[in-house]
Every structure is written in structure tokens, then in C-alpha cells.
From Swiss-Prot:
Homomultimerizes to form the nucleocapsid. Binds to viral genomic RNA; this interaction contributes to the virion assembly. N in the nucleocapsid interacts (via C-terminus) with the P protein (via C-terminus); this interaction allows to package the L polymerase in the virion and positions the polymerase on the template, since P acts as a bridge between N and L. N(0) interacts with the P protein; this interaction prevents the uncontrolled aggregation of N(0). Interacts with the matrix protein (inner layer); this interaction contributes to the virion assembly. Interacts with the L polymerase. Transmembrane segments: none annotated. This is Nucleoprotein. Belongs to the vesiculovirus nucleocapsid protein family. The lineage of its organism: Viruses, Riboviria, Orthornavirae, Negarnaviricota, Haploviricotina. The gene is N. It comes from Vesicular stomatitis New Jersey virus (strain Ogden subtype Concan). The keyword RNA-binding applies.
Length: 422
């Protein structure tokens, strides 16, 4: 219950409020409480031979119709199937039973698109052999289009062309460097549902002969789940279990956001779930796991990872409008505790040659850091030292960031460099 605020001059009560300027998060399980299926609207009445030509010529000219793209991908991939080695169930929806054959579009309910397809350009030179590389190319362009960094786009495009060459000797490069007409494809909900269905299917059937198509679709998995990825990444670089890491959450904002992400019943830890594809399948408009909805958690986790020498953390986005001071201290204490203690112990032994530690409680000095990684011990030590970073902590952080170079603005790396390398 919020405290009562009164004005001194007359004891009148006021209720401070802020405008509700953000949409609430949407959980994937809630979608299936109100909907039985994920509906994909696509045209199924045009022949594959025609669609293949329309798409090829459209991409080559730099102006393909997304309706042609969707219809072609459906027609070219609808026959791909795999045999389940276990029941496949997600959010109460049975996708298939053990030993049954399932197809990519069994993951959705396909309904006929009511909009008529536009005319396309024919091409007598196209054949079924093109279906071995053209779907890979289209879905790979989706991945290229999601990147805004020029050099990385070129790297992705080069990798995509290599994948297509492996798939078929008929491959032709249709897109030159610098073109971006495919960037808008992710705005089409039916296209992204196809992307999600393809990746979810081949994530289940990783050894399928068509699985290399995931080169382009893999970015659909855990889309807008950066804060959740931060949790896993910090657990890896710190060596702490997620349970132990949770006890190191020392800020209310971080705790609130962690509780938001750990809301039960969402199949976060179920590898074959719809959950990782909730954005592209349209199950959620606002991810509960994004860095936008969990800015304090994302900042705390990425800064701690950076101070533990994570190379990828330096490019993580720095959120705006968060309480930097307390979050920075919490990240520094966690990283200093982990960085000052090696989590090593004997794992195997022969005969009776087994080492056991002995606790020595005879002397406890507040200026001597704890030896382990117990958060209670470290908080006691931190309080004994005035509740602020010690010179050793600041030197630890300075060493961690001293070699960082070529840092982009508004990144965790840039923030840490300015904050600690003084």
C-alpha cells in the first residue's frame, strides 16, 4: 500500500501519479488461453511454378511482392516433414505424437488469404531445382535485413550465399551490397509466422537434410528476449547457478524485473515450446523478456559480465532513465566477489585421498574480503566498509576496462570505460 502524502499548509491529501505511457507486457501462455491456433493467412491457389518465377524475378528487380514471397515459401516448404521421437506439446496444444510425421505448417492453422495476389513476371528458366536454394536465400535475407551495421550485413550476405551454393549449383546472387528492399519484410505478420514455423520445426529436427535453412531463421528464436539472455550469459561467465545468481540481486528494480521474467507457466525452459517464437508468431506484442521492459536487470547483468571480462557485453545497449549509481555498485560488488574467488574444489579422488576444508572463525577482519561467493558474507563486508566501493574494487574495475577500445556510444562498454577508467 502506498504511503499517504499530505501538504504541510493544510494537511490535504494528494495522490501522486504518472501517466500510463507504456503498454503492459504480454505473456505467451495468455495467448493460448484465448486462442486455439496461430493462424497463417497465405494464398494457396497459385501454382508453385508460377510463384517461383514471380519471386525470383521480383527479388532480381528489387521489388518483390511479400504476398508472392509468403505464397512461394508455403508452397515450396509445405511438404517437408519429420518423424517425431517423442510427443510434441506446447501450451496444451498437441503438435504431434511420438512416431508421427509432422510438417512445418502443422505448427499453425493455414487459412486462405482473401487478398488477390498481384501479377508477377514469368520465367521459363526456373525449375524445381531452384527450390533447393531460393527459400534459403529469402529467409536469409530476413536475417540480413534485421542488422543495421553495414559491415555485419555484408558478412551475413556472404555467408548466406555460401549456404545457397552448397544447397544447389543453380544458385544465383540476386542482391547486391547496399540494397535494403527486404528490410521491411519483418513488418509482415504472415511472413514472420512462416519464419518462426520454419525455425521451430528445424530446431526440433536439427539433423534434417533441409535444416541449413535455419541460417536465416535462427534470429527468430528468442527474439526480443535480450534480458533473459543476459541472465543466462551472466550465469555462464560468473560460474554461478541461476539460483545462486538470483541471491545476488540487490536492487528493487532488478528484483521486480526478474520476477516479471520468471512469471510461471511460460515454458521458458522448454526447448520445443512456442515461447521462443512468441514475437514472430504474434503471441505477444510486448515481450516480458526484452531489455526495453527490463532495463535495470539488463544493465546490471551486462555490466557485471563486462567486469568479468565478457567480450560480448561491451556492445550491449545502455538503457536510458535508470538508477545508474546503485545498479553500478551492485554490479561491481558481484563481479568483484566472483573475480576475487576461484570456485575450484576437488572433483574426483582415489582411495581415501580426499581434501576437506576446515572453517576458521577465530579471526574476522572487516577489511579482508570473504573467500567464497556467499552474498551474505559479501554484504556484511561491504557494509563494514561503509557501504561503498573500496579502492580494491575500483582497481578491479579499472583493470577490467583498461584495454577496451573502439567502443560505440550508448553501450555498456562505453559507460564502464568512462565510469571506471579514470
Amino acid at each position: 500500500m502506498a504511503p499517504t502524502v499530505k501538504r504541510i499548509i493544510n494537511d490535504s491529501i494528494i495522490q501522486p501519479k504518472l501517466p500510463a505511457n507504456e503498454d503492459p507486457v504480454e505473456y505467451p501462455a495468455d495467448y493460448f488461453k484465448n486462442n486455439t491456433n496461430i493462424v497463417l493467412y497465405v494464398s494457396t491457389k497459385v501454382a508453385l511454378n508460377d510463384l517461383r518465377a514471380y519471386v525470383y524475378q521480383g527479388i532480381k528487380s528489387g521489388n518483390p511482392s511479400i504476398l508472392h514471397i509468403n505464397a512461394y515459401l508455403y508452397a515450396a516448404l509445405k511438404g517437408v516433414e519429420g518423424t517425431l521421437d517423442r510427443d510434441w506439446v506446447s501450451f496444451g496444444r498437441t503438435i504431434g505424437k511420438r512416431e508421427e510425421n509432422v510438417k512445418i505448417f502443422d505448427l499453425v492453422k493455414v487459412e486462405e488469404l482473401k487478398t488477390a495476389l498481384p501479377d508477377g513476371k514469368s520465367d521459363p528458366d526456373r525449375s524445381a531445382e531452384d527450390d533447393k536454394w531460393l527459400p534459403i536465400y529469402i529467409l536469409g535475407l530476413y536475417r540480413v535485413g534485421r542488422s543495421k551495421v553495414t559491415d555485419y550485413r555484408k558478412k551475413l550476405l556472404d555467408g548466406l550465399e555460401n549456404q545457397c551454393r552448397v544447397a544447389s549449383t543453380r544458385f544465383e546472387s540476386l542482391v547486391e551490397d547496399g540494397l535494403d528492399f527486404f528490410d521491411i519484410w519483418e513488418n509482415d505478420p504472415n511472413f514472420t509466422k512462416i519464419v518462426a514455423a520454419v525455425d521451430m520445426f528445424f530446431h526440433m529436427f536439427k539433423k534434417h537434410e533441409r535444416a541449413p535453412i535455419r541460417y536465416g531463421t535462427i534470429v527468430s528464436r528468442f527474439k526480443d528476449c535480450a534480458a533473459l539472455a543476459t541472465f543466462g550469459h551472466l550465469s555462464k561467465v560468473s560460474g554461478l547457478s541461476i539460483e545462486d545468481l538470483t541471491t545476488w540481486v540487490l536492487n528493487r528494480e532488478v528484483a521486480d524485473e526478474l520476477c516479471q521474467m520468471m512469471y510461471p507457466g511460460q515454458e521458458i525452459d522448454k526447448a520445443d515450446s512456442y515461447m521462443p517464437y512468441m514475437i514472430d508468431f504474434g503471441l505477444s506484442q510486448k515481450s516480458p523478456y526484452s531489455s526495453v521492459k527490463n532495463p535495470a536487470f539488463h544493465f546490471w547483468g551486462q555490466l557485471a559480465a563486462l567486469l568479468l571480462r565478457s567480450t560480448r557485453a561491451k556492445n550491449a545497449r545502455q538503457p536510458d532513465d535508470i538508477e545508474y549509481t546503485s545498479l553500478t555498485c551492485a554490479s561491481l560488488l558481484l563481479s568483484f566477489a566472483v573475480g576475487s574467488s576461484a570456485d575450484i574444489e576437488q572433483q574426483f579422488y582415489i582411495g581415501e585421498d580426499k581434501y576437506t576444508t576446515e572453517k576458521d572463525d577465530s579471526l574476522k577482519k572487516s577489511d579482508v574480503p570473504p573467500k567464497g561467493r556467499n552474498v551474505v558474507d559479501w554484504l556484511g563486508w561491504y557494509d563494514d566498509n561503509g557501504g561503498k566501493p573500496t579502492p580494491d574494487m575500483l582497481n578491479f574495475a579499472r583493470r577490467a576496462v583498461s584495454s577496451l577500445q573502439s567502443l560505440r556510444e550508448k553501450t555498456i562498454g562505453k559507460y564502464a570505460k568512462v565510469e571506471f577508467d579514470k
